[in-house]
Amino acid sequence: MIESQIVARVLPSKCREAVKVLLQEVYGYEDFRNLEVYDDLFRGKEKLQLSQGQLIEEVIMEAEKGIKGDSSAHNLLLTAPTGAGKSLLFQLPAIYLGNEYKLLTLVVSPLKALIVDQVEALRELGYERVAYASSDLSPEQKNEVYRRVREGEVDLFYLSPELLLAYDISYFVGERRIGLVVVDEAHTVTTWGKEFRVDYWFLGRHLEALKNALGYVFPVFALTATAVWNPEGGNDMIFDTIRSLHLAPCALYVGTVKRENIGFDITAMTIEEGETYDKAKQRTVAARVEDFLDGHKTIIYYPFAGGIDIKLKTWVYPANWHWVASYYGKKDKEQKAEIIQAFK
């Protein structure tokens, strides 16, 4: 069963007040923001404003059903644009579930840089019961993280799908009870899972087996900014994701993907007389890079990792080399960390 219609589900007043207090004390916000979502895509395309608070309450209520052994507990899938505050929608329930029930929330995410950014952002806010494990950590560091998780010092634990599928769950959590599993960047389950990172393709099956092995239920909350709704025209990433992650029964929230603060400026490249295409492209990129160096944060996508470091030297005058850097998967992890920090 896929439920798309927006239905108000309200926490008891005591719980609702606790959620509002966490919003203020941890994040420093007085009120929740609104998300623009479709009311019921099975019937039309009417949009409405959905408070982050309402969605957070639903996540908590589904987790509480799991605690009570209620088999009617739903999973959830949300599509919303980047910048809509999706991380708050699972972090705040995780903090609440940890405080109230000592439950652990697992966040499965494909991108190490995103994991580190979210964990560090929470720590900067003063919340310390969060940790992550990745290949960038030494074995000793990872073992210390697992110890903290097992001993109840961590309520929000980030890891990759490859790591989750590589070990028995007790290796990470010990006797801790899982209250919520979050799949961030959920579109990668289908877009990457078939060929690029195959563990994504088996993630849903693994989570189902995990529930059976543990003998209790917990909701899975999947979030993405880029899944496409197209049930009649093919290439429907939303239903592919629901099927792959075994999310049914699922409460589905489809938000608008258009961001009003993003524009596109497509300009045809000019090739001067006697100039080859490659020379014209190099000249154009070099000119644009010089423009961007005027105090603007800019990301330029290059199709190949190999050769990008040499290309940078041709695009930028030597006096400005310290303002630019290349970033790709095989770069040294210390260098990548320094680049991310400098870009911030």
Regions found by a protein language model. Give the residues of each.
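Conserved helicase ATPase core of P-loop NTP-dependent helicases/translocases
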Residues: 140-147, 323-344
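Conserved pre-motif I regulatory segment
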Residues: 12-79
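Conserved helix/coil segment N-terminal to the catalytic DExD/H
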Residues: 137-180, 188-194
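Walker A/P-loop NTP-binding motif
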Residues: 64, 84-101, 121, 208-210
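Conserved Walker A/P-loop ATP-binding site and its immediately adjacent core
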Residues: 88, 102-126, 130-141, 160-165, ...
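Post-DEXD/H (motif II) to motif III coupling segment of the RecA-like Helicase ATP-binding lobe
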Residues: 179, 187-254
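Walker A/P-loop
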Residues: 69-93, 105-111
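Conserved strand-helix element at the start of the C-terminal RecA-like helicase core
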Residues: 104-115, 288-318, 324-328
